[in-house]
UniProtKB/Swiss-Prot annotation:
Residues 66-320 form the Protein kinase domain. This is Protein kinase byr1. It comes from Schizosaccharomyces pombe (strain 972 / ATCC 24843) (Fission yeast). The modification Phosphothreonine is found at T218. PROSITE patterns: PROTEIN_KINASE_ATP (PS00107), PROTEIN_KINASE_DOM (PS50011), PROTEIN_KINASE_ST (PS00108). It catalyses: L-seryl-[protein] + ATP = O-phospho-L-seryl-[protein] + ADP + H(+); L-threonyl-[protein] + ATP = O-phospho-L-threonyl-[protein] + ADP + H(+); L-tyrosyl-[protein] + ATP = O-phospho-L-tyrosyl-[protein] + ADP + H(+). Pfam families: Pkinase.
Length: 340
């Protein structure tokens, strides 16, 4: 469905060739944008540190203190329910981890880092507790659901809304890396959630290595957004999250994944998918989309992770900067998908 760049003659650019003035202008613009981002990043972190509206840590959370309102669905490796604690509604995710008490305690310790999470782009965390052979994570309830569900209900995301979603996703990743020192590891539309205030936040990130190991994820669901280096068995890095971001943007913009197979549930379909990710040229947005957006996605989807953009470099790109400046009523858009 996407035009793919072909280079059958193996042409390469001359590294000693002179740079055109237009290229110099573009490079200067990127440098200026990068400086602008760097000068504002401290203010952004300061804003996060002084957030007033965020879930407070609740020390007495346990299974008996929660009233189950309704089942919300299945998350990565666990069931998610809307629950009520006193007058607070929250989303509880229950993950089976087994009967090893040392493992359970280690997971709860690792989750403790979320006490310090103060970002408008990361879903709030009330606390976690062990019950039988499960760990329950109690999080901020986002009443408009995930981008995955919104995409199914509403179709491709409007371009002005998409820009704001990308702004929020990249800022969320930067907060995870710079403040919590966490790599997301499973970035995709189903792990980006929205509320009726128009806030867009990341969830289900890999804060606990042991919990990640305990979660039984299907290989297909994960591999769809997986970077080529991860499929080859390479190390997971920040750049792997950026690849997943690029694939997610294509899906949100077109309501289609770059590689689709009718028999994706069988082993042949999975192998075809993995072959495409590793061997085929990177997917691109169709030419009908704005050039700045297409260049932004291209920067996310270099096969070589050393050439792939970092989160900071993405922030310096013209598309990201332009999306920041556009005023969009996200709350009105999000209210169309509010859960009853």
């Amino acid at each position: 469905m996407f035009k793919r760049r072909r280079n059958p003659k193996g042409l390469v650019l001359n590294p000693n060739a002179s740079v055109k003035s237009s290229d110099n202008d573009h490079k200067e613009e990127l440098i200026n944008n990068q400086k602008s981002f760097e000068s504002n990043v401290e203010a952004f972190m300061e804003q996060c540190a002084h957030m007033n509206r965020r879930p407070a840590w609740i020390s007495d959370l346990d299974n008996s203190s929660l009233e189950v309102v309704r089942h919300l669905g299945e998350g990565n490796g666990g069931a998610v329910s809307l629950v009520k604690h006193r007058n607070i509604f929250m989303a509880r995710k229950t993950v089976y981890v087994g009967s090893d008490s040392k493992l359970q305690k280690q997971i709860l310790r690792e989750l403790g880092v979320l006490h310090h999470c103060r970002s408008p782009y990361i879903v709030g965390f009330y606390g976690a507790f062990q019950y039988k052979n499960n760990i329950s994570l109690c999080m901020e309830y986002m009443d408009c659901g995930s981008l995955d569900a919104i995409l199914r209900e509403g179709g491709p995301i409007p371009l002005d809304i998409l820009g704001k979603i990308i702004n929020s996703m990249v800022k969320g990743l930067i907060y995870l890396y710079n403040v919590l020192h966490i790599i997301h590891r499973d970035l995709k539309p189903s792990n980006v959630v929205v509320n009726s205030r128009g806030e867009i936040k990341l969830c289900d990130f890999g804060v606990s290595g042991e919990l990640v190991n305990s979660v039984a994820q299907t290989f297909v669901g994960t591999s769809t957004y997986m970077s080529p280096e991860r499929i080859r068995g390479g190390k997971y890095t920040v750049k792997s999250d950026i690849w997943s971001l690029g694939i997610s943007i294509i899906e949100l913009a077109t309501q289609e994944l770059p590689w689709s197979f009718s028999n994706i549930d069988d082993s042949i379909g999975i192998l075809d998918l993995l072959h495409c990710i590793v061997q085929e040229e990177p997917p691109r947005l169709p030419s009908s989309f704005p050039e700045d957006l297409r260049l932004f996605v291209d920067a996310c989807l270099h096969k070589d992770p050393t050439l792939r953009a970092s989160p900071q470099q993405l922030c310096a790109m013209p598309y990201f900067q332009q999306a920041l400046m556009i005023n969009v009523d996200l709350a009105s858009w999000a209210s169309n998908f509010r859960s009853s």
